[in-house]
């Protein structure tokens, strides 16, 4: 077999390498080119395994993407990749509830960082884990491990979307306008809606 490979590709020599490709990585890359991304299948399997509330995940995905489009136009070459990661984060951010409701975001982040997730590189998993970790609770833990602006962009979108859908019901949200500023984001929400949603308004105040 090796002789045939050398002949077919006109190879002259072979050099030993201490590195190795992860099992299945070539099939994974080939699948992405043919629009059969293994990562999508993995995310769907995790949602089923950890009994994710799919309606809530869909609500948050929709709102998080709407926020992202205000901060990163769809014609930006980075948009597709960032949007894809945001969708995965929105679908998986509650998998830790299967472990415990308390600090579930930490459990979600741990599972994502350490589980076997076919199609995802360890770097991808680490990034996804940080975004999920940052969607809730204090941000100091995330600040200690990343200063990457694009990750904070996704954290902001996921965090705000989760906050707006804290009631976990289908309801019409107000228009939300966001812009990126030098050291964070500027948020504008309809005052009448905030007055009618005092609990959400209080949580938003805590975020400022």
Language-model features, listed with the residues they occupy:
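Short, non-transmembrane amphipathic alpha-helical segments
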Residues: 196-208
């Amino acid at each position: 077999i090796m002789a045939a490979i050398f002949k077919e590709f006109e190879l002259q020599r072979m050099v030993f390498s201490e590195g190795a490709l992860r099992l299945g990585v070539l099939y994974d890359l080939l699948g992405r080119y043919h629009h059969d991304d293994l990562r999508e299948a993995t995310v769907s399997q995790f949602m089923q395994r950890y009994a994710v509330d799919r309606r809530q995940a869909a609500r948050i995905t929709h709102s998080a993407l709407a926020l992202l489009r205000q901060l990163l136009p769809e014609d930006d070459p980075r948009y597709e990749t960032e949007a894809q990661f945001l969708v995965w984060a929105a679908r998986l951010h509650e998998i830790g509830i299967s472990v415990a409701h308390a600090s579930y975001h930490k459990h979600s982040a741990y599972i994502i960082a350490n589980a076997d997730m076919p199609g995802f590189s360890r770097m991808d998993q680490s990034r996804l884990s940080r975004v999920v970790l940052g969607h809730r609770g204090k941000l100091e833990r995330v600040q200690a491990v990343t200063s990457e602006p694009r990750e904070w962009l996704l954290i902001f979108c996921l965090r705000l979307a989760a906050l707006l859908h804290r009631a976990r019901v289908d309801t019409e949200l107000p228009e939300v306008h966001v812009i990126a500023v030098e050291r964070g984001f500027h948020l504008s929400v309809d005052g009448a809606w905030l007055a009618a949603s005092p609990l959400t308004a209080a949580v938003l105040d805590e975020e400022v």
